[in-house]
Amino acid sequence: MAPAGMSGAQDNSCLYQEIAPSFQRLPCPRTSSRHFSEAMTCPCGWRPFKGGPGGLKGPVWPAKEENSCSHGRIQRVQRRRVPSASPLIQKINRRSVLFHPYCWS
């Protein structure tokens, strides 16, 4: 009985250790960093989100910048992510204001 109980406990801790890191990675750090890097390289990719429900309509980028950026590719990548991370995008929209100065520099 004792050895079985011990092996069961070991299995549990092993499983927990395996699950814990993946749970920590899942919620947001990885996706948000990807989104932020996209925002820094090309602000145009964020335009569809801002013009949506009523985000920031103030900073509108000139057409020249729109054409120079490869925003088509980024738009496609983000559009694919929207359904799975809509709450995440709302959080990023709020924070992206702080990140826009980096886009301009």
UniProtKB/Swiss-Prot annotation:
Tissue: Expressed at high levels in adult testis, at moderate levels in sperm and at low levels in fetal testis. Not detected in other tissues.
Protein name, UniProt field: Spermatogenesis-associated protein 8
Species this protein is from: Homo sapiens
